[in-house]
Curated annotation (Swiss-Prot):
Name this polypeptide is given: Homeodomain-only protein
Function: Atypical homeodomain protein which does not bind DNA and is required to modulate cardiac growth and development. Acts via its interaction with SRF, thereby modulating the expression of SRF-dependent cardiac-specific genes and cardiac development. Prevents SRF-dependent transcription either by inhibiting SRF binding to DNA or by recruiting histone deacetylase (HDAC) proteins that prevent transcription by SRF. Overexpression causes cardiac hypertrophy. Acts as a co-chaperone for HSPA1A and HSPA1B chaperone proteins and assists in chaperone-mediated protein refolding.
Gene ablation phenotype (knockout): Mice display partial embryonic lethality and heart failure.
Start-end of DNA-binding region: 3-62
Record-linked Pfam families: Homeodomain
Organism: Mus musculus
Any one GO molecular-function label of the UniProt entry: DNA binding
Induction: By the transcription factor NKX2-5 that acts as a direct regulator.
Subcellular location(s) of the protein: Nucleus; Cytoplasm
SMART domains noted in UniProt: HOX
Family matches, as InterPro entries: HD, Homeodomain-like_sf, HOPX
Subunit field text: Interacts with serum response factor (SRF). Component of a large complex containing histone deacetylases such as HDAC2. Interacts with the acetylated forms of HSPA1A and HSPA1B. Interacts with HSPA8.
Length: 73
C-alpha cells in the first residue's frame, strides 16, 4: 500500500487522478474506474469518491448546476 495519509491521496496519486479526470474521462465507467484505481494504488471506493468530489468542484468552477452531469446536459 502507498504512503497515503488519512486526509486523502498522495501527490503522486492525485497526479494520476487529475490526468485521468482532465485528459481521459470525467465520468469513468466501472471498468475504467477500476483501472484508474489500480494505477493510482487506491481502492475503487476511494477513486469513485475522489471523482465525485472533483466533478462537483469542476461543476462549480464552470458555473454549472450541481445536478448537471456535463456541459451538454
Amino acid at each position: 500500500m502507498s504512503a497515503q495519509t488519512a486526509s486523502g491521496p498522495t501527490e503522486d496519486q492525485v497526479e494520476i487522478l487529475e490526468y485521468n479526470f482532465n485528459k481521459v474521462n470525467k465520468h469513468p465507467d466501472p471498468t475504467t474506474l477500476c483501472l484508474i484505481a489500480a494505477e493510482a494504488g487506491l481502492t475503487e471506493e476511494q477513486t469513485q469518491k475522489w471523482f465525485k468530489q472533483r466533478l462537483a468542484e469542476w461543476r462549480r468552477s464552470e458555473g454549472l448546476p450541481s445536478e448537471c452531469r456535463s456541459v451538454t446536459d
